[in-house]
Amino acid sequence: MGAYETEKPTKDAAALETQSPEDFDQPSPLRKIISVASIAAGVQFGWALQLSLLTPYVQLLGIPHKWSSLIWLCGPVSGMIVQPIVGFHSDRCRSKFGRRRPFIATGAALVAVAVFLIGYAADFGYKMGDKLEEKVKVRAIGIFALGFWILDVANNTLQGPCRAFLADLAAGDAKRTRVANAFFSFFMAVGNVLGYAAGSYTNLHKMFPFTMTKACDIYCANLKTCFFLSITLLLIVTVTSLWYVNDKQWSPPPRNADDDEKTSSVPLFGEIFGAFKVMKRPMWMLLIVTALNWIAWFPFLLFDTDWMGREVFGGDSDGNERSKKLYSLGVQSGAMGLMFNSIVLGFMSLGVEWIGRKLGGAKRLWGIVNFILAAGLAMTVLVTKFAEDHRKTAGDLAGPSASVKAGALSLFAVLGIPLAITFSTPFALASIFSSCSGAGQGLSLGVLNLAIVIPQMIVSLGGGPFDALFGGGNLPAFIVAAIAAAISGVLALTVLPSPPPDAPKATTMGGFH
């Protein structure tokens, strides 16, 4: 399909609020866009800590395995519900502080509350009656689960308005929109690197000796310390950005009495489903490609360190001491691989715009890197086979050879290339397509988020049972993920419309009819 043609929306087309014309004067200076994008570093620092430190913390609290998946499921569930709602209201917020800033500030405050509950769950549980000798600390688990859910809600409250704010600052300029999302992806990588580095340092708790208590061992103390650093970084970048970058107060466009009556009669989720009803073909294609892309990504994001511990190192979390140690070494190597992945992601994010131009556009770049993702996921089978062959000659508890370990870590690093595109291009295309169709940035990005979280829920619920059907291990899910990545690449190249070089400025629209 050729370049996406702008179609001026009609009154029946619905409708979703966007910026008024006076807010679309010129794109904001790059320094302001970078300032807002830097909030991603604070958000992602906390996410990296979750991945690197919460597993031993969960074991410390004694959360049963059958319930742990439900706790991790809260991310996509809260994303599916919270982000569209936040996007809806941020498109229509009339606060004197602007449309996006109140939500970003609220999200940052909720993150502070959440990490406090998570970090001090063991201490609060002990004060409320948990016994140190008990394996399962019920009260601490309840506090931890509450904090974990609040943290996911807070992150979704932050990220949607941040991306919508970047789209506002780009003022309908397609190139500036792509650059803004590339910087957002870059700062996500910065936050990841900082988080994984902090999580891998076992003596970080010495910065704050008070973090170690009778109920809180070294893992717990390190978690507290890391979260203190995380919230400090998040508050610094958030306060700086919200103070430095102006967010104009929004006023709804004039409507007649019939419009007001119809708008007020439509409930919130009517607006959300209405967005699907009036969505143009480019946005539908974007949702399909994005959903397939995340079916490909999420199994690896969930099981990458487990794959290192189980298939590459040959360990077992439920085996004997030597087997458990091998598994632990594999998980630590996986965390190192994630750091390499984040470093590559960061550098790739800075070059997304230039590389996209050289390859002929954003959709072509996305299609190509999806094939890189498919090849990388398929290579996990080869790395696993080499690791198994080495154990046949060196012994079951020998661990991987240096070449196998290097190959696995290289795989982590290479996958940082497609991940950088996944974190930037779909959001940039959603902003561009919504500007062309007149849809609100916040709600459009919230709808796009559904194409991300629904695949995550499917993988979270079905990944384990699917692997068990084929004898366990992580490879069955990785193979399906590779196939999904290849299909996503084909669709990105064939059915996804090319965005215009410079999208025209959005037109003001009335309420939903």
Curated annotation (Swiss-Prot):
It comes from Arabidopsis thaliana. This is Sucrose transport protein SUC1. Optimum pH is 5-6. GO terms for biological process: pollen germination; response to nematode; sucrose metabolic process. Changing residue 65 to S: Reduced sucrose transport activity, reduced sensitivity to DEPC. GO terms for cellular component: mitochondrion; plasma membrane; plasmodesma; vacuole. GO terms for molecular function: sucrose:proton symporter activity. It catalyses: sucrose(out) + H(+)(out) = sucrose(in) + H(+)(in).
